[in-house]
Amino acid sequence: ADFAADREGFLILDEIYQGLSHGPVPYQTGLAVRDDLYILNSFSKFFGMTGWRLGWVVVPPQAIEPITKLAQNLFISPSTPAQYAALAAFDEDAMTIHGQRKDAFVQRAARLSDGLQRLGFRIPVAPDGAFYLYVDISHTGMNSMDFCWRLIDEFQVAVTPGADFGEHNADHFVRFAYTTHLEAIELGLERIEAALTAWGVNT
């Protein structure tokens, strides 16, 4: 915040994964730090409403009018049912369900991490939020693109090459998502083990 303020810059906070931490995280609103922040959020992650195209932005008062004009020229309004669904997402019962989903992500992360490491994959940074693992596949001897294509073509397991997320060592990394249920994760691990065996990769 100080860095941006010293340079008369804007500070934009992307809080799209807010609420999906795997452990307790003290939360303080960004507005307690500065009152001229731009804060972006969405219903797609924590609320599980991917594809509904719903979100919100908190902006300084002087930015409300230009941001409104920009929004009116970039997209049309979401459907009325989607907006009512978004309101319902804040109901007490709905918030309980969201909390249960978050707990399920923690269990899935642990199972997927354990299973992949047992198969020789390295996970340099354990996840502490969201629903992704960034995994080192160096021991397979493949680059990430080849690994991803072969895994989906031959064993019907979809993962994403590291190049989609940056350049640093991207050829050696892929991203796994644990957005599915534990049974599917178990099946995926079985298929990955079969793939490594078929490809002659030592685990």
Predicted regions and their residues:
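Conserved core segment of the aminotransferase class I/II
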Residues: 38-103, 110-115, 195-196, 201
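Generic structural signal for small/hydrophobic residues in well-ordered secondary structure
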Residues: 1-4, 14, 37, 55, ...
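Short beta-strand segments
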Residues: 12-17, 41, 125-127, 132-136, ...
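Conserved glycine-rich beta-strand-loop-beta hairpin in the small C-terminal domain of fold type I
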Residues: 87, 102-113, 124-137
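Active-site pre-lysine segment of PLP-dependent enzymes
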Residues: 1-11, 15-49, 62
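Helix C-cap/helix->beta junction micro-motif
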Residues: 6-7, 119, 155
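PLP-dependent enzyme catalytic core of the Aspartate aminotransferase-like
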Residues: 141-143, 150-159, 165-203
